[in-house]
Amino acid sequence: MIMKKTLSFLLFIFCVFSLQAETIKTKVKSDAMNKDIPCVIITPTNYNPSATYPVIYLLHGYGGNQNTWPNIKKDLSQTATQDSIIFVCPNGENSWYWDSPFNKESQFETFISKELVSYVDKNFSTRDDRTGRAITGLSMGGHGALWLAIRHQDIFGAAGSTSGGVDIRPFPDNWDMKKQLGEYINNKEIWDNHTVINQINKLQD
């Protein structure tokens, strides 16, 4: 009797875990930065290579990494399965998701919008056009999502932002931005060109 209960319990545990979405921890090669970027990719438990899935790119905030979103949103796996979505969580370091004109190892606009999207579309069964891609993020990641979505409307069909700043210029000494853009006092034009609010005119109807 005890053996039957034990086997039944183990079978139950196996079934529960087999219904969880798959969480894939990988590294994606960036030719632009000549390094590998850690990423977490979450696929539905009923992932079918014959089907195609929309992809949501989740960008973390300052001080975060590829594990930030899976840690703060414990139900990402459940959502991936329920809504048949693939979630992609890259490590954006403290890059603000720009291509830094000063730091060749911080070219995250190119990485996210080109290299990572290409990797995901090549290795997973995705809806590989803008209608199948969305991007969103928190704080620095919210800024990055807007920055990338506005500048790459051919890649991302939808965007969201939670607490993402749209004008970085009032904060020249904060959050390592000057490591990416240089000192504000000497590089005002660069700062002007890298703030989201000055990209609005690029939005298409």
Description of each model-found segment:
Residues 6-17:
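Sec-dependent N-terminal signal peptides
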Residues 1-3:
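N-terminal secretory signal peptides that target proteins for export/translocation
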Residues 21-205:
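Non-catalytic cap/lid and distal C-terminal segments of serine-dependent acyl enzymes
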